[in-house]
Curated annotation (Swiss-Prot):
Protein name from the UniProt record: UPF0053 protein BUsg_314
Its membrane topology: Multi-pass membrane protein
Domain CBS: 309-368, 372-432
InterPro entries: CBS_dom, CBS_dom_sf, FAD-bd_PCMH-like_sf, FAD-bd_PCMH_sub2, Integral_membrane_TerC, Ion_transp-like_CBS, Transptr-assoc_dom
Family listed: Belongs to the UPF0053 family.
One matching Pfam family: TerC
SUPFAM superfamilies registered for this protein in UniProt: CBS-domain pair (SSF54631), FAD-binding/transporter-associated domain-like (SSF56176)
């Protein structure tokens, strides 16, 4: 009992436990890396068995203290070097550590797939356990000799080794999980093992490297990695604040971006391998149409209804107050299949009719108002989001839906074709001209052109800063503060917008140049 009341005993025990843990950190790192080679359900078992056998081996070595001490006596000696059993063990262990760490580093640097658990070839369970025990034998030797040099009581040494091993067991799973989550730490740990293996070989050959240098290098590397992990954590935190859809869009768009210099600076070569690689890159590159469509799909949910719809000014509608002959001529001259039928003005919608069916009804002298009222319009608010709009269009069964504001004023209409154009680009009707015409060093653009489509064509994100503007004309009016006159030029970031044609109430045509 007096044995445990001695403060010096407790101080020696505490110091020895700390030293055993410090000396066991390199072993712990190697255990964590080896455990990853096993299936997830076997990792804990291998770790426990490996460290458990290592504990038994350390206790056995402690019980043979007198024999362990003699391991430092030279067995090979000449004028150039001398080697003891301890030196041989350190040499073999150091070389094995260098070999194993180099193989692991090669796999990491070659970027082999460590995440595909379905097709991953796992190592044998007992092969990993044996490696853990063998490496622990090398690391144990230093720990046991340190214990013998510090404390005289065998019981204290055994207690310290047991406590240190228990702490290592508790920390091993957390360390393994941390390394599995943070893959950059694996490369850092393997670099540590290379340093440790080199120091073991140097020590065995009597080239003494101060431990302080080794620990200082490891400590500094850990500090740099801590900064790296903090930076990565902050980056992920900032990314998590973005909507999931935006993050997915940015990630996919980054995959589609191709460096223009890769095409401009491509060097012609007769090397067959380089030709094959070049052609494969050509085939794997996203085409402009594919980029446009993928971007359209990913950004669809974030757009407003106004940016998708056919605006009020472009709606062809049938006025019941016109004569039958006027209505017949309108139906025959306009290349549309569906028409809203209204009484006097567009806001007084009676119904939606097909041109062919209405012509047949007129020939049968059926009243236009009565015929149109059989198919009432589907009206949606201009605040509806595009995702819910798709469900409404499905219920419309091939017809279109009318977009109205909170005051009941018709803003436009949307057909399934409008949604397709928002994704894949413009499909002009027979009576339409393209919204955007590419000139030599500029673009000739209609004022009613959708801003999202224009942004994609110009490959910029500088135009849409708020949701109030859906068209180019609306953007320029908002930028100017009033309706600009023909001949005026408005500059927005790196683009110049020259007003080619404008009326008293809208912008018709704009020429865009990049500064």
């Amino acid at each position: 009992m007096e044995f445990f009341l001695d403060p010096s005993i407790w101080a020696g025990l505490l110091t020895l436990v700390v030293l055993e843990v410090v000396l066991g950190i390199d072993n712990l790192i190697f255990v964590a890396i080896l455990s990853e080679k096993l299936p997830p359900n076997q990792r804990d078992k291998a770790r426990l068995i490996g460290l458990g056998l290592a504990l038994i081996m350390r206790l056995a070595l402690l019980s043979l203290i007198s024999w362990v001490v003699t391991l430092t006596s030279p067995i090979i000696s000449n004028n150039f070097f001398s080697l003891s059993i301890r030196d041989l063990i350190l040499l073999i262990g150091g070389l094995f550590l260098l070999f194993k760490a180099t193989i692991e580093l090669h796999e990491r640097l070659e970027n082999e797939d460590h995440e595909n658990t379905e097709n991953k070839n796992y190592a044998s369970f007992w092969a990993v356990v044996i490696q853990i025990v063998v490496l622990d034998a090398v690391f144990s030797l230093d720990a046991i000799i340190t214990a013998v040099g510090m404390v005289n009581q065998l019981l204290i040494m055994m207690i310290a080794v047991v406590l240190a091993t228990i702490l290592m067991l508790l920390a091993s799973k957390a360390l393994t999980n941390f390394i599995n989550i943070h893959q950059t730490v694996v490369v850092l740990c393997l670099s540590f093992l290379l340093m440790i293996g080199f120091s073991l070989v140097a020590e065995a050959l009597k080239f003494y490297i101060p431990k302080g240098y080794l620990y200082a290098a490891i400590g500094f590397s850990i500090l740099i990695e801590i900064f790296n992990q903090i930076a990565r954590h902050n980056f992920m935190k900032n990314q998590s604040r973005k909507p999931m859809r935006q993050r997915a869009a940015e990630a996919i768009l980054r995959l589609m971006i191709r460096e223009k210099n890769n095409n401009k600076n491509r060097i012609k070569t007769d090397n067959k391998a380089e030709i094959v690689l070049s052609s494969s890159l050509e085939t794997e590159t996203f085409k402009d149409e594919e980029k446009y469509m993928i971007n359209g799909v990913l950004t669809l949910a974030g757009r407003s209804i106004k940016s998708i719809m056919t605006p009020r000014s472009n709606i062809s509608w049938v006025n019941t107050e016109k004569t039958i002959n006027e209505i017949r001529l309108q139906l025959l001259d306009t290349p549309h299949n569906l028409f809203p039928v209204c009484k006097g003005e567009l806001d007084e919608i009676i119904g939606i009719v097909r041109a062919k069916e209405l012509l047949v009804a007129i020939e049968k002298n059926i009243d236009v108002y009565t015929f149109a009222s059989q198919i009432p319009p589907i009206i949606i608010p201009d605040t509806l989001d595009p995702i819910n709009l798709l469900g409404v269009l499905r219920r419309a069964q091939g017809s279109f839906v009318i977009v109205s504001n909170e005051f009941g004023v018709v803003q436009g209409l949307i057909t399934p074709l409008d949604v397709l154009e928002a994704i894949a680009g413009e499909f002009p009707d027979a009576d339409e001209t393209p919204d955007i015409i590419k000139e030599q060093n500029s673009w000739l653009v209609k004022g009613e052109t959708d801003l999202h489509s224009l942004q994609q064509l110009l490959n910029t994100k500088e135009l849409i800063k708020q949701d109030d503007c859906a068209s180019l004309g609306g953007l320029l009016i908002s930028q100017k503060g009033q309706l600009p006159l023909p001949g005026e030029t408005i500059k927005i970031n790196s683009f110049s917008f020259h007003i080619v044609n404008a009326t008293e109430y809208r912008i018709d045509l704009v020429r865009i140049t990049k500064n």
